[in-house]
Amino acid sequence: MLGPIRPIGRLWSSLMKSILSTKYQLEKGITIGLMTYLTKMRGGEKGPPFVGLIELWWSWLGSFCGIFACAFLSFYYQVPLLIGSFGASAVLIYAAIDSPLAQPRNLVGGHIISAMVGVTCFKLLGVTGFSCAMAVSLAILVMLLTRTLHPPGGATALIAVITPSIQPLGYYYVLAPAGVGALIMLLVALLTNNLANKRRYPRYWS
């Protein structure tokens, strides 16, 4: 009577050992994966050095002149040439001029492409949480594909969706303020950055 039961018992014991071993390996893998994931958040590299007074001066001068030029021309000609995302662009093209994200192709191309994406999302999807997320994420995707990644472009796309004063402009938003404003900022960057002996802008055009 016990003969047939013994193989079943051995099979059951082997199955339980296999399940426990798999469970252990799975838990071990999850633990290691979680620890690796959390370790990435520790950083570990040294922070950048402090900026010298001369660098502070040129960064201040460029950003002041760039934003002032857009604001002055906007008020004088009663044409929208200034949007909030230009404030973020000023940080890059006047204070982090060696960054690949600050080069002319990225500055102008990033704003124009993002403006087109933002307006399109607004026209097709209206003003919703989905359209806001789609505008920003799609703008990032297209900028990456076209080698025009410019972080302020995400804001340019979002502005097209959520700003009531911008919405009536439609695709004119791509021309002004996005396109023309970015060109004004670029012109000021070319003039001010290259006045400094140790600065050279841009690093490349294409």
What are these regions (language model features)?
Residues 2-112, 116, 120, 125-133, ...:
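Alpha-helical transmembrane segments and their membrane-interface boundaries
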Residues 82-86, 150-156:
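Transmembrane helix boundary and interhelical junction motifs in multipass membrane proteins
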Residues 91, 114, 151, 157-158:
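Short, electropositive, low-hydrophobicity segments enriched in small/polar residues
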Residues 98-106, 143-154:
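Membrane-helix interface "capping/anchor" motifs
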Residues 116, 120, 145, 157-160:
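Active-site beta-strand/loop microenvironment that shapes enzyme catalytic pockets
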Residues 126-152:
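Internal alpha-helical transmembrane segments of multi-pass membrane proteins
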Residues 135-142, 157-164, 178-183:
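Hydrophobic alpha-helical segments of small multi-pass membrane proteins
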